[in-house]
Curated annotation (Swiss-Prot):
GO terms for biological process: protein complex oligomerization; protein folding. It holds the Pfam family Nitrate_red_del. This is Chaperone protein TorD. The keyword Membrane does not apply.
Length: 221
């Protein structure tokens, strides 16, 4: 199997992982969602370990296991409180998951990054979930975009090298331009559990690894 065939095979997993992250940041985990996450995480941990993310994934696995000290009926509630404290409070108290907050000097939402994402979605004919009504520069939308973009490139059998270059530039310019600042801010906010801090750290390293893989893919041809 040559490099192009290997990368094509990897794209299905890439799309699934970006979608998984997007869903985690879109809304709070319900009790059912949390049960599913805990049940499926051993297989996800194996996948992340294969991507050189074993330390970051192990931290999330430990954080999920440590939820056992919280009474079962309260676990999802505690995580919902962490979600709200991290992402939903006013900017000086939380880490808003919007690019504009980190890239615009006035830290106002609906800034230039939101406009750029709206234009990107229109030009690439990517349809997001209609019930997700956050500003277009919400972190979950960037992750949804990557998932849909990867899937469409597989379905349409797009030129893999050209697509790798485009996706590399998207990650560099649209996401990694502010994701490290967001991740660092999250780590300084006190929360009850370490689940979301671990998810955020895993996401940052995943995106960085994916960007590097895209660069390596383009340079190998």
């Amino acid at each position: 199997m040559n490099n192009s065939q290997q990368w094509q095979a990897a794209n299905t997993a890439r799309a699934a992982l970006y979608r998984w992250f997007a869903e985690l940041f879109a809304r709070e985990l319900t009790k059912t969602n949390l049960t599913q996450l805990q049940a499926q995480y051993p297989s996800l941990h194996a996948a992340f370990s294969d991507l050189n993310l074993e330390p970051q994934s192990a931290a999330l696995q430990t954080a999920l296991e440590n939820l056992q000290v919280i009474p079962a009926p309260d676990r999802a509630l505690e995580l919902a409180a962490d979600f709200a404290h991290l992402f939903l409070l006013s900017g000086h108290q939380s880490a808003p998951p919007y690019a504009s907050y980190y890239l615009e000097s006035d830290q106002m939402l609906y800034g230039k990054p939101a406009q750029q994402m709206s234009e990107f979605l229109a030009s690439h004919k990517l349809d997001l979930h209609p019930e997700f009504r956050e500003p277009k520069d919400h972190l979950s939308i960037y992750l949804q975009v990557m998932s849909l973009w990867i899937k469409s490139s597989v379905d349409e059998q797009a030129n893999l090298i050209e697509m790798a270059v485009q996706q590399q530039h998207f990650l560099e310019d649209a996401l990694l331009s502010w994701l490290p600042k967001f991740a660092a801010r999250c780590q300084h906010i006190r929360v009850k559990t370490q689940v979301y801090p671990a998810i955020i750290d895993l996401l940052l390293h995943f995106v960085q690894e994916d960007r590097q893989a895209l660069e390596d893919m383009a340079e190998a041809e």
